[in-house]
């Protein structure tokens, strides 16, 4: 990947995404901020549209966390956190680098002190949704970054949170 190839950031206005955009630009990378409202109906055509731009990498910083989801919210969370990343991975060219933001919630309540190759043991719907995504990201150009982020949402939130 070279600096002429743009990096697309999905979820560019969220808690993690806006910081990723800022850091990449500070380092001199060309960044495309995606503001697409991803749905099961538009996912594959929109991903193909990204491919047509000949992007060098896609950073999936989207995510949904719902403490006590009802059935409809749970379905939405499973789609954004679990199913969408697997579709993204399968639809992008195998040569396009995909960096996916996951969570230590894949390890459940024993998340503290886990290693990257420990077995999954989610104990929440959120953790399970992140496991679904990780299992769908297969190949050398598919990277997973697990983090435990706690803080306000979006670019206009207080700058006193963990990443800023």
Predicted regions: what is each one?
Residues 2-26:
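N-terminal Rossmann NAD(P)H-binding glycine-rich loop of SDR-like oxidoreductase domains
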Residues 40-80:
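NAD(P)H-binding glycine-rich loop region in Rossmannoid oxidoreductase-like domains
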Residues 30-40:
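A short beta-strand-loop structural module common to alpha/beta enzyme folds
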Residues 86-121:
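Conserved Rossmann-fold NAD(P)-dependent oxidoreductase catalytic core, especially the SDR/UDP-sugar
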Residues 68-75, 109-112, 155-156:
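Conserved catalytic-core motifs of eukaryotic protein kinase domains, centered on the activation segment
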Residues 72, 76-84, 116, 120, ...:
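Glycine-rich NAD(P)-binding loop of the Rossmann-fold in SDR/ketoreductase-type enzymes
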Residues 10, 34, 61-62, 98-104, ...:
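SDR active-site strand-loop-helix element
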Residues 135-164:
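NAD(P)-dependent short-chain dehydrogenase/reductase
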């Amino acid at each position: 990947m070279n600096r002429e190839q743009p990096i697309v950031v999905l979820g560019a206005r969220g808690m993690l995404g806006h910081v990723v955009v800022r850091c990449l630009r500070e380092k001199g990378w060309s960044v495309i901020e995606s503001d697409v409202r991803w749905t099961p109906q538009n996912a594959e055509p929109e991903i193909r549209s990204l491919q047509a731009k000949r992007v060098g990498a896609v950073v999936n910083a989207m995510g949904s966390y719902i403490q006590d989801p009802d059935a409809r919210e749970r379905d939405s969370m499973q789609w954004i956190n679990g199913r969408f990343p697997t579709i993204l991975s399968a639809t992008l060219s195998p040569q396009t680098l995909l960096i996916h933001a996951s969570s230590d919630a894949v390890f459940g309540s024993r998340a503290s002190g886990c290693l990257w190759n420990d077995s999954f043991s989610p104990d929440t719907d959120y953790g399970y949704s992140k496991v679904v995504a990780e299992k769908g990201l297969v190949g050398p150009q598919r990277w997973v970054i697990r983090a435990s982020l706690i803080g306000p949402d979006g670019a206009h939130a207080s700058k006193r949170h963990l990443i800023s």
